[in-house]
Curated annotation (Swiss-Prot):
Gene name of the record: PLP3
Protein name per Swiss-Prot or TrEMBL: Patatin-like protein 3
Domain PNPLA: 38-252
Domain-related comment: The nitrogen atoms of the two glycine residues in the GGXR motif define the oxyanion hole, and stabilize the oxyanion that forms during the nucleophilic attack by the catalytic serine during substrate cleavage.
Species name: Arabidopsis thaliana (Mouse-ear cress)
Enzyme category, top tier: hydrolase
Main location: cytoplasm
One Pfam family it belongs to: Patatin
Outcome of gene disruption: No visible phenotype under normal growth conditions, but mutant plants exhibit an impaired response to phosphate deficiency during root development.
Motif (GXSXG): 80-84
Length: 428
C-alpha cells in the first residue's frame, strides 16, 4: 500500500458495501491515483466515428494487458448521449451468455464490434426514402406526418440485446443524459444516483431508446419505473442532445458530486484537483466549417423553414452545435486553467461536409466514408480549443490523436495495475 496515500480502512470498505452487490470490472478510484472518464457525443449514424476511435484505444489496452482487456476495465465513468448512449450500453452491459469462461464480468461488445454493428443495423434503423417519399414528398411527410422514422427496428434491437438489464447492472458507472418533455428539464441517468434512488434505476433499453429519440427523427419515449416503495414514476423523454450532446461535463459533474459527498470510493481526491482527473472525450464530427446557413437565408425563414430547410433541420443543427462547442470550450478552460490540459483529450473533426454531416444517411457509401473519417482522425494532430478565438487549433507538440491515445492507454493500464496491487481482494 502506498504510504503517501495511506491505506483504505475497513470502515471505508464497509461503507461501500452497496458496490459489492454489483458486478463491476473497474476497481474504484480509492485504490488508485486518478478518476477516469470516457465521454461519447451524440450524432446518429456518425457514431461510426467514435466507434473507430474506441476500437483503436481498446486495441492499445489489449497490447498492454492482454486480449481480454476491455474499455470497461479502465474507466470509472463512461458517459454518452444519443448514439453515444447506445455505444455506452454496448460497452458496459454484462454479457450473460457465459461465453467468457475465464472472466464473467465481460461486456456484451468489444469496441472493435461497434462499427460492424452500425454497418449492419443502420440501414434498418435509418431506412432511406424511396419513390414518392423522396424530395418534396419527404419534406411534406416530415412536416405533417410525424417523425421521420418510427423507431420500431431500433427499439426491438436495443430491447433484444439489453433485455431487462438495469442501469446499476452495468459493469462500470454510466452517465446518460435525456430530456423530459413533460417537465421541460434534463434527466441525467447516473449509476451513482441509481444505487440510492430506485426510481432512477431504469432499464438500460429504456434509457437508450430515450436518449436516441431525436425530435423530428424518432418518436418520444414514455416509460414508468418503480421506486423502493413501489411508487411508479413516469418519464416522458426525448434525445439527451437537447441538453448535453457532448456529455463530458455531465460525467465530470457526477464524479464531482460524489467527491463533495465524500463517497469513500473516491478516496482523497479533491473536487478541484484536476491533476487527478483523466478525461477522454470523443465527438461524432461537426458541420461547422461547412457554413450551411447565413443571416441572409435565415432572415427569410419562418417557423417551418427553421424546422426543416433543404433536407436539414436548422434549429436542431444550431442547438446541437452550440451545446457541443460550449461544453468543449468550458472543459478546455477548466483543464487549462488548472494546469491539467494533458489529462484531457478531445478528439473530434469539425470539417465534415455533404452527406457525412448528416445523422441519418445510411447508404453504404456514406457509412464507408464515416469509417474513413474516423481512421483519418487518428492520424490528425491533437487539437484544442483556442480560448480566445473559440476555434480548434493543433497543440504546439507534434502529436497525433493516435499517439495521444497510446499515451493515455499506458496511463490507464498503469492506473489499473496500481488499483489491483492495492486491492485486498486481489492480494494473494
Amino acid at each position: 500500500m502506498d504510504t503517501e496515500r495511506g491505506s483504505i480502512s475497513s470502515s471505508e470498505i464497509s461503507r461501500t458495501a452497496h458496490l459489492q452487490d454489483r458486478t463491476v470490472a473497474c476497481l474504484p478510484p480509492s485504490y488508485g491515483q486518478l478518476v477516469t472518464i470516457l465521454s461519447i457525443d451524440g450524432g446518429g449514424i456518425r457514431g461510426i466515428i467514435p466507434g473507430t476511435i474506441l476500437a483503436y484505444l481498446e486495441s492499445q489496452l489489449q497490447e498492454l494487458d492482454g486480449e481480454e482487456a476491455r474499455l470497461v476495465d479502465y474507466f470509472d465513468v463512461i458517459s454518452g448521449t444519443s448514439t453515444g448512449g447506445l455505444i455506452v450500453a454496448m460497452l458496459t452491459a454484462q454479457d450473460q451468455s457465459g461465453g467468457h469462461s475465464r472472466n464473467s464480468n465481460r461486456p456484451l461488445f468489444e469496441a472493435k464490434e461497434i462499427v460492424p454493428f452500425y454497418l449492419k443495423h443502420s440501414p434498418k434503423i435509418f431506412p432511406q426514402p424511396r419513390g414518392i417519399f423522396c424530395g418534396w414528398g419527404e419534406t411534406i411527410v416530415r412536416l405533417v406526418g410525424g417523425p421521420k422514422f418510427n423507431g420500431k427496428y431500433l427499439h426491438d434491437l436495443v430491447e433484444g440485446f439489453l433485455g431487462d438489464t438495469k442501469l446499476t447492472q452495468s459493469l462500470t458507472n454510466v452517465v446518460i443524459p435525456c430530456f423530459d418533455i413533460k417537465k421541460l428539464q434534463p434527466v441525467i441517468f447516473s449509476s451513482y444516483q441509481a444505487v440510492n434512488n430506485q426510481a432512477m434505476n431504469a432499464k438500460l433499453s429504456d434509457i437508450c431508446i430515450s436518449t436516441s429519440a431525436a425530435p423530428t427523427f424518432f418518436p418520444a419515449h414514455r416509460f414508468t419505473n418503480e421506486d423502493s416503495e413501489g411508487i411508479k414514476h413516469e418519464f416522458n423523454l426525448i434525445d439527451g442532445g437537447i441538453a448535453a450532446n457532448n456529455p463530458t461535463l455531465c460525467a465530470i459533474a457526477e464524479v464531482t458530486k460524489q467527491i463533495i459527498k465524500k463517497n469513500p470510493v473516491m478516496g482523497d481526491i479533491s473536487p478541484l484537483d484536476f491533476t487527478r482527473f483523466l478525461v477522454i472525450s470523443i465527438g461524432t464530427g461537426s458541420i461547422r466549417n461547412q457554413e450551411k446557413y447565413n443571416a441572409k437565408m435565415a432572415s427569410k425563414w419562418g417557423l417551418m423553414c427553421w424546422v426543416f430547410e433543404s433536407g436539414s433541420t436548422p434549429i436542431l443543427d444550431c442547438y446541437s452545435e452550440a451545446i457541443h462547442d460550449m461544453v468543449d470550450y468550458q472543459s478546455s478552460v477548466v483543464f487549462q486553467a488548472l494546469r491539467s490540459e494533458k489529462n484531457y483529450l478531445r478528439i473530434d473533426d469539425d470539417s465534415l461536409k455533404g452527406d457525412l454531416g448528416s445523422v441519418d444517411i445510411s447508404t453504404e457509401k456514406n457509412m464507408e466514408g464515416l469509417v474513413e473519417v474516423g481512421e483519418a482522425l487518428l492520424k490528425k494532430r491533437v487539437s484544442r480549443v483556442n480560448l480566445e478565438s473559440g476555434h480548434y487549433q493543433p497543440i504546439s507538440e507534434n502529436v497525433t490523436n493516435e499517439e495521444a491515445l497510446k499515451r493515455f492507454a499506458k496511463v490507464l493500464s498503469e492506473e489499473r495495475k496500481l488499483r489491483e496491487s492495492r486491492s485486498p481482494k486481489l492480494k494473494i
